[in-house]
From Swiss-Prot:
Its EC number is 5.3.1.6. The gene is rki1. Pfam families: Rib_5-P_isom_A (PF06026). This is Ribose-5-phosphate isomerase. Pathway: Carbohydrate degradation; pentose phosphate pathway; D-ribose 5-phosphate from D-ribulose 5-phosphate (non-oxidative stage): step 1/1. The keyword 4Fe-4S does not apply. It is found in: Cytoplasm.
Length: 274
């Protein structure tokens, strides 16, 4: 454990995510990048932490997928951009709720799925980082909260029964945290429905059916979009899966040596976002 990890006092799961993030950035940081996408969720803090150590990072434009990642970019003094101004993204780093053996995944637990899908579509490479709990054979095996679906507010009531017809088990409108009355509202002013379909053996077919429903803005099924995924395990190893079919496991001693980072940088990025 390096000095930064001691100061941060990371749990085994957080350390696993951090190791996986550092390796993902090291292996996928392009030569002379111009635009990089920054996803949402708990892993992206460690992604940015590693990006700050890369050469030429000050000249790179970073595109966020939501408010959290926007604040992360700004608070670290990086250049902020929008997808309408920079539609060509070299690589995007993001997290996931669950990834299956075919690198299809469920995303949107943080209610940013439309922006995440847009940046993933614009990116030449989508690199996913998560802890090993998100690694499954079939979608729905471990993630039981359902497929997030962003919908127009006026359409949610009509969409719920149609999702049941498609096989959803008690789909629900996602409600806000205890401090907020009413449903979760996305950055785009829409609602989120969480629809659990059990084991999803054909994500592409399910995605197509849901997307056709009137009022659906986006579906949290990311099909045939991932270039590589990095899963961090509690033992410090990192499992790497690529769209080419390549799969390998990097043992803990290697990841520990490869992911030393300056303690000051780590402390800076560990501070709460404003």
């Amino acid at each position: 454990m390096d000095s930064a990890e001691k100061k941060l006092d990371l749990s085994p799961i957080e350390l696993a995510k951090r190791l996986a993030c550092h390796m993902a950035v090291d292996e996928n940081y392009p030569e002379n990048p111009k635009v990089i996408g920054i996803g949402s969720g708990s892993t992206v803090v460690y992604v940015v932490e590693r990006l700050l150590t890369k050469p030429g990072v000050d000249s790179v434009v970073f595109i966020p997928t939501g408010f959290q990642s926007k604040q992360l970019i700004v608070n670290n003094g990086l250049r902020l951009g929008d997808p309408d101004c920079y539609p060509n993204v070299d690589v995007s780093f993001d997290g996931a709720d669950e990834v299956d053996d075919n690198l299809q995944c469920i995303k949107g637990g943080g209610a940013c799925l439309f922006q995440e899908k847009l940046i993933a579509f614009l990116a030449k490479r989508l690199v996913i980082v998560a802890d090993s709990r998100k690694n499954s054979h079939v979608l729905g095996e471990y993630w039981k909260k359902g497929v997030p679906i962003e919908v127009m507010p006026m359409a949610y009531a009509s969409i719920l029964p149609q999702l049941v017809e498609l096989g959803a088990i008690e789909p629900k409108l996602r409600m806000g945290a205890p401090g907020k009355a009413g449903p979760v509202v996305t950055d785009n002013g829409n609602f989120i429905i969480d629809a659990h379909f059990g084991l999803i053996k054909n994500p592409k077919e399910l995605f197509a059916k849901i997307k056709l429903l009137v009022g659906v803005v986006e579906v949290g099924l990311f099909c045939d979009m991932i270039s590589a995924v990095y899963f961090g395990s509690k033992d410090g190893s990192v499992t790497v899966k690529k769209a080419s079919g390549e799969k390998h496991i990097i043992p803990a001693p290697v990841t520990a040596a490869a992911n030393e980072v300056d303690a000051k940088v780590a402390e800076t990025n560990a501070k709460p976002l404003n």
